Amino acid sequence: MNPKPEADRKLSVVVAGGGTAGHIEPAMAVAEAVRAQRPDARITALGTTRGLETTLVPARGFDLQLIPPVPVPRKLNKDLATLPLRLRKALKETKRVLREVEADVVIGFGGYVSAPAYLAARSLKIPFFVHEANARAGVANKLGVKLGGTGLAAVEDSGLEAEIVGIPVRESVLQLDRKALRAEAREFFGVDPEAPLLLVTGGSQGARSINNAVVDAAKTLQDAGIGVLHAYGKKNDIELPAEVQEGKPRYVAVPYIERMDLALAAADAILCRSGAMTVAEVSAVGLPGIYVPLPHGNGEQELNVRPITHAGGGVIIKDAELTGHRVSQEVIPLLRDETRWQAASLATLAAGHRDAAEKIAEKIIAAADA
């Protein structure tokens, strides 16, 4: 373990969360929060060449150190036989990085790089934290807590012994003033400046079931005076009826939304999947949601959003039950009733954990100073 940071030595924190945005964004949010509290801190991100971190981390102004990926097979297969060798290589490289940056604390967020980070931190006697964003903990994070890491979780009953802190959300989302940006955001996307607006997204690749249902509901929503901003996915296409294309309020369809901050500011409600990071960002800005959990995996997407729906901040529609009629049934009463909408917005905000990144940063700094 590194000695307590001296006054003339910078605090050194390593964040490990590569692969998908769901692992990287919480890591970056915590990195930003540590930097806000300790501006001179040295922050290093661990990643691999396989993940989105190769672009996302440098774009946020943090140092990225690459290690060999170690995906842990969930089933018995040929990859299991090579796991020990791959893990040894990754562990050796991770130890090198931790020594080089004189790490005081390590925090992992799951994904390919977390297991080597936890093992290396334990071996070098560096205090480490394990953050689980999903409702059901992954293999790497379960390992991390068993190795002695301090568990932090987004929700109860994740399968980890952990303190509930929520999901760290980036500062740009936390500081988003939707009311102040509303007019600019609506002009940016070319949607109606006044009509209630439904934001629709199935993620960067889109979701066919969501696309089909919302297109089916398009005329009914338009007749009810509701506009739509629909990101249908780069690999998909949709065909709107001519009467909808020519009608008002406008139905604006785009393959992908680069300025999601402006989309959140423009919208009055969102229809989307319920990945952990999506739920965290939507709740952080107080946007009521109609959530359609991904129908695959272990059901974690539905569990991710349960705290929001139980609080009254949104509803869940199962993918198999998603139709144009059901979309209209949920969206129109929400967006045409100001009292109902306001209650849902406040419930969404209350159910979130806007201070998650700040709290985690405080714990990291306290562990380093102990």
Swiss-Prot record:
GO biological process assignments: carbohydrate metabolic process; cell division; cell wall organization; lipid glycosylation; peptidoglycan biosynthetic process; regulation of cell shape
Pathway as given in its UniProt record: Cell wall biogenesis; peptidoglycan biosynthesis
One MF term in the entry's GO annotations: undecaprenyldiphospho-muramoylpentapeptide beta-N-acetylglucosaminyltransferase activity
Keyword Transcription: no
Organism: Corynebacterium jeikeium (strain K411)
Subcellular locations according to the entry: Cell membrane
EC number in record: 2.4.1.227
Keyword tags: Cell cycle, Cell division, Cell membrane, Cell shape, Cell wall biogenesis/degradation, Glycosyltransferase, Membrane, Peptidoglycan synthesis, Transferase
Catalytic activity: di-trans,octa-cis-undecaprenyl diphospho-N-acetyl-alpha-D-muramoyl-L-alanyl-D-glutamyl-meso-2,6-diaminopimeloyl-D-alanyl-D-alanine + UDP-N-acetyl-alpha-D-glucosamine = di-trans,octa-cis-undecaprenyl diphospho-[N-acetyl-alpha-D-glucosaminyl-(1->4)]-N-acetyl-alpha-D-muramoyl-L-alanyl-D-glutamyl-meso-2,6-diaminopimeloyl-D-alanyl-D-alanine + UDP + H(+)
Domain of life of the organism encoding this protein: Bacteria
Family matches, as InterPro entries: GlcNAc_MurG, Glyco_trans_28_C, GlycoTrans_28_N
Gene for this chain: murG
Annotated function: Cell wall formation. Catalyzes the transfer of a GlcNAc subunit on undecaprenyl-pyrophosphoryl-MurNAc-pentapeptide (lipid intermediate I) to form undecaprenyl-pyrophosphoryl-MurNAc-(pentapeptide)GlcNAc (lipid intermediate II).
Family under the similarity heading: Belongs to the glycosyltransferase 28 family. MurG subfamily.
Cellular component annotations (GO), alphabetically ordered: plasma membrane
Topology of this chain in the membrane: Peripheral membrane protein
Residues annotated to bind UDP-N-acetyl-alpha-D-glucosamine: T20, A21, G22, N134, R170, S204, I257, Q301
Protein's name according to its UniProt entry: UDP-N-acetylglucosamine--N-acetylmuramyl-(pentapeptide) pyrophosphoryl-undecaprenol N-acetylglucosamine transferase
